């Protein structure tokens, strides 16, 4: 979630956010996801990983216009990309200042994710999203 008073580049044109209130503070929902180990996923992949192993990082980095580079030596086969070290570090710092991660355990995580995507329309979700920004998010994330 995007913290109050924080923004991301609106290169998608007219970002529409759903706001949620936690402890009487409003946050704008950007993304929702599932994982078998959310703490590891958030800490290792999203906050301290790279754009090659985090959909959230790849999308945010693409919004910031960061240059994509080959993720590993298998690029010719898998076409996976990430961002350069300086951009990855800048993205990590931005995420730590501007985002709040909220999570909870649930036995039906896939159903819950579908429900949250359908009802909150997070603009940065790619799979399963009906958000108006979906096509543009795909374009920005496209590995060229």
Predicted features and spans:
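GIY-YIG nuclease catalytic motif and its immediate N-terminal context
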Residues: 1-90, 94-144
């Amino acid at each position: 979630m995007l913290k109050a008073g924080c923004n991301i580049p609106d290169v998608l044109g007219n970002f529409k956010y759903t706001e949620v209130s936690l402890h009487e503070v409003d946050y704008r929902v950007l993304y929702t996801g599932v994982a078998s180990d959310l703490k590891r996923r958030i800490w290792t992949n999203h906050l301290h990983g790279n754009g090659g192993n985090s959909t959230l990082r790849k999308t945010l980095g693409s919004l910031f216009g960061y240059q994509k580079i080959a993720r590993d030596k298998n690029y010719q086969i898998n076409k996976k990309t990430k961002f350069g070290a300086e951009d990855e570090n800048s993205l990590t710092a931005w995420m730590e200042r501007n985002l709040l991660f909220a999570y909870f355990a649930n036995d039906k995580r896939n159903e819950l994710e579908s429900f949250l995507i359908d009802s909150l329309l997070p603009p940065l979700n790619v799979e399963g999203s009906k958000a108006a920004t979906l096509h543009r998010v795909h374009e920005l994330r496209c590995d060229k």
